[in-house]
Regions:
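Small-residue-rich transmembrane alpha-helices that serve as helix-helix interface/gating elements
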Residues: 333-346
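Membrane-embedded transport module
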Residues: 16-76, 90, 97-291
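Basic, alpha-helical nucleic-acid-binding regions used in initiation and control of genome expression
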Residues: 87
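C-terminal membrane-solvent junction of multi-pass transporters and transport-like membrane proteins
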Residues: 205, 209, 288-310
Length: 347
């Protein structure tokens, strides 16, 4: 009887973790009940529906279209010819490797190992890749905001850009190539499966991302502008001479005579700028994860960690041996230590 059908379907649902003791009977329907129920009523129930048994091909297709009307992204699995209408209607059709030719042609993806676990792994990797792209955008746009504003402010104040063309080439190499490799190589994280599905209308740059990009970018610019002002008034020969009170006094001091920035000061500025972006790459790694920037470093040491070391080594070699080509002079180990520790405060 129908009662036995319901009981059997609930038991199957319980065994696969779909049906729980708290679920009410209205979360299960037969194909006949589904067909006889008008769309208006089904639209109110479809998000709570867990099991539909004895469904015909048109019932499956109708279910897909009702879910899509609720702005859901629908994936359908099937292996038979009767699954073709639903596979065609869904945004993602998944056919089994041993399914019929009709089902495979109607689907977008064929699961060769016939395992539902492959679907969840694919979703996990897709979500992880999407998050990695967002991390790269956060990192890249922050550098763009900082670099562009530094150049613009310099132009308005009638001073030359403190970063030369060759230095900007190195910054762009970090921004486009190394950071892309580092952030794209981050391993997948099973916790992304706990995130709610995105709407099809969601933009890849979210509001938290925009706030982070503008907030951190403007903060970097404010600090770097103050650093330029300080160097123009202080004429230091070692970073140990840096004075925080002098930094704040010189911030808006446009009346005291200024001097041209020395090669040493330009080298300091260039290195501080790059190291700020270096640490910001760690911030981008941790963006929207509620974890430390150094979490799971062991899992990503071969990719992210290696790229981070390459950036540090490249910056050291450029400053130490770059000379006139990069408009730099070598820095002492004390300077390197102070810059490394000071810029890490952005974490």
């Amino acid at each position: 009887g129908l009662g036995d059908v319901y009981k059997r379907q609930r038991e199957i649902g319980r065994q696969i973790g779909l049906w729980t003791e708290e679920d009410t009977p209205d979360r299960l329907m037969t194909g006949v009940e589904f067909e006889q129920t008008p769309d208006a009523e089904l639209l109110d129930r479809v998000m709570d529906l867990k099991i539909m048994c004895r469904a015909r091909p048109m019932d499956k297709e109708r279910l897909v279209k009702l879910l899509q009307k609720k702005d859901q992204v629908v994936a359908v699995t099937g292996d038979g010819t009767n699954d073709a209408p639903a596979l065609n209607a869904a945004q993602v059709g998944l056919s089994m490797g041993d399914g019929t030719t009709v089902a495979k042609e109607a689907s977008a993806i064929t699961i060769l190992d016939n395992s539902f676990m492959s679907i969840s792994r694919a979703v996990m990797w897709g979500r992880s890749l999407y998050r990695n792209i967002q991390r790269f955008i956060v990192f890249q746009m922050t550098i763009n905001v900082a670099a562009c504003l530094i150049v613009l402010i310099g132009a308005f104040l009638g001073t030359e850009s403190p970063l030369t063309v060759t230095q900007m080439l190195w910054v762009n190499l970090i921004m486009d190539t190394f950071a892309a490799l580092a952030l794209a190589s981050l391993p997948s994280d099973e916790r992304v499966m706990q995130d709610p599905p995105r709407k099809t209308t969601d933009h890849i740059i979210t509001r938290p991302m925009g706030r982070n990009i503008l907030g951190v970018g403007i903060l970097f610019v404010a600090f770097l502008f103050g650093l330029l002002q300080y160097f123009k008034h202080a004429d230091i020969t070692s970073l140990t001479q840096f004075s925080l009170s002098g930094y704040f006094r010189s911030y808006l001091d446009f009346s005291t005579p200024e001097h041209e920035l020395t090669g040493y000061e330009l080298s300091l500025f260039f290195t501080i700028f790059v190291l700020l972006q270096f640490w910001n790459m760690f911030n981008a790694k941790a963006f929207n994860t509620h974890q430390s920037a150094f979490a799971r470093m062991g899992a990503s040491i071969g990719g992210f960690g290696l790229v981070a070391l390459l950036i540090l080594a490249g910056q050291y070699l450029i400053v130490t041996f770059g000379g006139k080509m990069f408009n730099v002079v070598p820095l002492s180990w004390t300077d390197w230590g102070l810059i490394f520790a000071g810029t890490s405060l952005v974490l």
